[in-house]
């Protein structure tokens, strides 16, 4: 690992955490717009309710494996890309939850004693 003198590893661009995590729904929304396809048309193609798809696109609901595979089949967006985005989003959201991070700290303190 190359380190720069006087530069905190947290301040190197590759180590920065984005201010706002990217939910996979944003990618789906952008692709729909670029292809001039409506949310309702995609929902119909993959056999889900328009409200379910809208919740994913708005970031209110996560993308699971089945949904990722259906979107891949309909739009040729790799399912693993959607799942990786979802996983990174979930991780960043958990790490930004102060209450949860305090809980983790407490668990680590207890585990250190064991």
What is each model feature region?
Residues 37-55:
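Short alpha-helical DNA-recognition segment
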Residues 83-114:
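Short, charged recognition helix plus adjacent turn
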């Amino acid at each position: 690992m190359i380190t720069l003198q006087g530069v905190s590893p947290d301040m190197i661009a590759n180590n920065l955490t984005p201010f706002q995590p990217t939910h996979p729904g944003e990618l789906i929304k952008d692709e729909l717009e670029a292809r001039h396809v409506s949310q309702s048309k995609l929902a119909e193609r993959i056999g889900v309710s328009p409200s379910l798809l809208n919740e994913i696109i708005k970031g209110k609901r996560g993308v699971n494996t089945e949904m990722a595979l259906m979107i891949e089949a309909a739009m040729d967006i790799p399912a693993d890309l959607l799942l990786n985005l979802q996983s990174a989003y979930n991780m960043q959201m958990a790490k930004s939850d102060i209450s949860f991070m305090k809980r983790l700290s407490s668990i680590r303190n207890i585990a250190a004693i064991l």
